[in-house]
Regions:
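Residue-level recognition of single "structural anchor" positions
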Residues: 1-193
Length: 193
């Protein structure tokens, strides 16, 4: 049996670097918050999953509130059938676990632990993600997926020795190759799962 912590992290939708003529809404001045209360389409949901071996899944999921269908699309064939899901009390996780026929341990609101099941590891991951993202003073949402991959790479190789990290960096930086024009890159939309 494997235990997986599933959780979401919310970022404000950012058009940083977009010219005023191309903006779909007026810009937020001096870092003001999202205007709508609660989770809205002005926010981006990043889904995260972490198991006991520190295997990490971190991807842009959707704008606004996540659904069980989006979770199925993301985690299909990535989580084993005999896994136990440890999540918060969001309804999408309950429906997802039921649809995928997985054992589900729900941690109640205001709690972090129930018996031997907890969400401390994923909470720790989110605090380090938040610290890491704060260094950049805001990231355009269209590039957020790239930053999540970068964070995953750093998290995956942080425990290795420096010489192994350098070899891994060289290997991973030269494997993927894609041909993209600058014009296409500037005007692209965020890539959700």
């Amino acid at each position: 049996m494997f235990s997986h912590n599933l959780y979401k992290y919310i970022f404000a939708y950012s058009y940083k670097g977009t010219k005023p003529a191309n903006m779909p809404r007026p810009s937020r001045k001096r870092g003001k918050q999202v205007k709508k209360r609660g989770i809205s389409n002005e926010q981006v949901c990043v889904a995260t999953a972490l198991d006991r071996q520190r295997n990490l899944i971190i991807e842009l999921l959707c704008t606004g509130r996540m659904t069980s269908d989006e979770l199925k699309k993301l985690y299909n064939n990535r989580i084993g059938e005999d896994s136990i899901l440890c999540t918060d009390s969001h309804k999408s996780y309950m429906q997802f676990a039921e649809d995928m026929e997985l054992e589900h341990k729900r941690i109640k609101r205001g709690k972090h632990k129930e018996d031997i099941y907890h969400i401390q590891h994923i909470n720790s991951l989110h605090s380090s993600l938040k610290r890491w993202m704060n260094r950049f003073n805001g990231v355009a949402t269209k590039y957020l997926g790239n930053y999540m991959k970068w964070f995953k790479w750093i998290d995956t190789f942080s425990a290795e020795k420096e010489s192994i990290q350098i070899k891994s960096f060289m290997l991973h930086s030269h494997i993927p190759y894609s041909y993209t024009k600058i014009k296409e890159f500037k005007n692209r939309m965020p890539i959700f799962v």
